[in-house]
């Protein structure tokens, strides 16, 4: 099989040296991503495209799908590479491949040609198009906005019959820009902002501030791993987790209620900047959007930025929530985000939207900064590939069931609001309500002689919580997916 990789247009307008560097990096990224699919795979770079050749036909769909998710690729062409001897030979090889697709449709032929030939590209289009029109009675030529476009590429004495065109995600190859550290919470915004920086050519590392216990961290780890595995697996990245509960406790005790949100964000930026400096990362990435919450006004954002010299990138600054959710749905993080607990929003009951620098600094004078230094020093740092290994090892231990036995009970772990809106009723089995955010403290109070089948609407949070309970030593948990 053969694929022709077309470059993102912004790469093609770079200077010769920069363009060659980008193409070289993209070629390496493709090799890194595809090496597990086919050991015989070959990746060859050219000035205006990259070729991927592989022998294992069973891997064709997987290779094609992986290529569409590598930053720097505008689109890929799945081609059949055959020799040709004449214009008529080109037509004869094109007819059987396209006959079925053209029946009852309007079409045109488009040819791209490289090398020296006795004919022009337009002459090939006319000859092949005329032949197809004659031999397929129900087909009709239409040069403007046809139903089907027959794409052919000719390179010296080889004919590339284009069997399919698949759009890539565009952007720059990862590694062409410097590393960044994304402050990831697992919600809609941080996942999308991380993706946008990967698409722009940055290797994205992840920093997670844990405010809600082990279950929250498990969920965020899986979001980070999903993003890396889907769009950035050509490079090794770090996942740094900082236990921020002591910092939150100090803020709740020492800081005025209205200033808590801004002070918390300032502490996060301070901590993330220390992590970035430790690993030589050039910038921080956040999912903040202007005016979305109280801490994201211009005044408050300026005060948050003031605590660090590290550049803070906010790719979503002008996006509205609906658009962000649409992007999350497009890249596949929507389900994760919908079931991710949000802890930051409950820290302050009456937050200020226009903080005063002197007042913020006065409040921070009460804060014990040794606590911040300690949590940064004790931060865990793992290779993101280890998350997959840990998850695979753990997932095997959590059984998913579609029915229930005599000693089983269903545990509805949705939030109270969701349960009131759509109560769960299952005949023949006891249904108990215990929201996910109470599992860590209340699950032990349940009847441990029963097997508890955790249930939520999408199955994401129930699986994460089952993993967490298993880690805590509870073996009587399964995931219920009818």
Swiss-Prot record:
Keywords: ATP-binding, Cytoplasm, Disulfide bond, Nucleotide-binding, Redox-active center, RNA-binding, Thiamine biosynthesis, Transferase, tRNA-binding. Pfam families: ThiI, ThiI_fer, THUMP. One of its GO terms (biological process) is thiazole biosynthetic process. GO terms for molecular function: ATP binding; CCA tRNA nucleotidyltransferase activity; tRNA binding; tRNA-uracil-4 sulfurtransferase activity. The active site is at 456 (cysteine persulfide intermediate). Pathway: Cofactor biosynthesis; thiamine diphosphate biosynthesis. Disulfide bonds join 344-456. Its main location: cytoplasm. It is an enzyme of class 2 (transferase). Residues 61-165 form the THUMP domain. It is found in: Cytoplasm. Its EC number is 2.8.1.4. It catalyses: [ThiI sulfur-carrier protein]-S-sulfanyl-L-cysteine + a uridine in tRNA + 2 reduced [2Fe-2S]-[ferredoxin] + ATP + H(+) = [ThiI sulfur-carrier protein]-L-cysteine + a 4-thiouridine in tRNA + 2 oxidized [2Fe-2S]-[ferredoxin] + AMP + diphosphate; [ThiS sulfur-carrier protein]-C-terminal Gly-Gly-AMP + S-sulfanyl-L-cysteinyl-[cysteine desulfurase] + AH2 = [ThiS sulfur-carrier protein]-C-terminal-Gly-aminoethanethioate + L-cysteinyl-[cysteine desulfurase] + A + AMP + 2 H(+). Catalyzes the ATP-dependent transfer of a sulfur to tRNA to produce 4-thiouridine in position 8 of tRNAs, which functions as a near-UV photosensor. Also catalyzes the transfer of sulfur to the sulfur carrier protein ThiS, forming ThiS-thiocarboxylate. This is a step in the synthesis of thiazole, in the thiamine biosynthesis pathway. The sulfur is donated as persulfide by IscS. NCBIfam families: ThiI_C_thiazole, tRNA uracil 4-sulfurtransferase ThiI. Belongs to the ThiI family. This is tRNA sulfurtransferase. It comes from Klebsiella pneumoniae subsp. pneumoniae (strain ATCC 700721 / MGH 78578). The gene is thiI.
């Amino acid at each position: 099989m053969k694929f022709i990789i077309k470059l993102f247009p912004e790469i093609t307008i770079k200077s010769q040296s920069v363009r060659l560097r980008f193409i070289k990096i993209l070629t390496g990224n493709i090799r890194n991503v595809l090496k597990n699919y086919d050991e015989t795979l070959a990746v060859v770079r050219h000035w205006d495209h990259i070729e991927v050749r592989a022998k294992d036909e069973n891997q064709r769909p997987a290779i094609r799908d992986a290529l569409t998710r590598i930053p720097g690729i505008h689109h890929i062409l799945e081609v059949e590479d055959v020799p040709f001897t004449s214009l008529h030979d080109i037509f004869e090889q094109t007819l059987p491949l396209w006959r079925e697709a053209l029946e009852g449709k309007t079409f045109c032929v488009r040819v791209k040609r490289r090398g020296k030939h006795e004919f022009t590209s337009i002459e090939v289009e006319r000859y092949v198009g005329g032949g197809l029109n004659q031999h397929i009675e129900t087909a009709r030529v239409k040069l403007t906005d046809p139903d089907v476009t027959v794409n052919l590429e000719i390179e010296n004495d080889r004919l590339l019959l284009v069997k399919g065109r698949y759009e890539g995600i565009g952007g720059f190859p990862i590694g062409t820009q410097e590393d960044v550290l994304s402050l990831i919470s697992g919600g809609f915004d941080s996942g999308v902002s991380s993706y946008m920086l990967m698409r722009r050519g940055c290797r994205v590392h992840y920093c997670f501030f844990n405010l809600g216990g082990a279950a929250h961290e498990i969920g965020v780890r899986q979001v980070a791993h999903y993003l890396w595995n889907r769009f950035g697996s050509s490079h090794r990245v770090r996942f740094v987790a900082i236990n921020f509960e002591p910092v939150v406790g100090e803020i709740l005790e020492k800081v005025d209620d209205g200033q808590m949100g801004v002070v918390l964000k300032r502490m996060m930026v301070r901590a993330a900047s220390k992590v970035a400096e430790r690993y030589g990362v050039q910038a921080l990435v956040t999912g903040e959007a202007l005016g979305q919450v109280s801490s994201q006004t211009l005044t408050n954002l300026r005060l948050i930025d003031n605590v660090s010299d590290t550049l803070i990138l906010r790719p979503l600054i002008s996006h509205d929530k609906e658009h962000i959710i649409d992007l999350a749905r497009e890249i596949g993080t929507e389900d994760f985000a919908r079931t991710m607990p949000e802890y930051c929003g409950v820290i302050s009951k009456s937050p200020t939207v226009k903080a005063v620098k002197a007042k913020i600094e006065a409040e921070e004078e009460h804060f014990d900064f040794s606590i911040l230094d300690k949590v940064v020093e004790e931060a865990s740092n793992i290779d993101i590939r280890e998350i997959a290994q840990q998850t695979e090892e753990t997932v095997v231990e959590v059984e998913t069931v579609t029915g229930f036995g005599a000693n089983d009970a269903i545990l509805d772990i949705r939030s109270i609001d969701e349960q009131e809106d759509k109560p769960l009723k299952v005949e023949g089995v006891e249904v108990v309500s215990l929201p996910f955010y109470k599992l860590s403290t209340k699950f032990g109070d349940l009847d441990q002689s029963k097997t508890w089948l955790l249930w939520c609407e999408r199955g994401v949070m129930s699986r994460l919580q089952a993993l967490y309970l298993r880690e805590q030593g509870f073996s009587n948990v399964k995931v219920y997916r009818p």
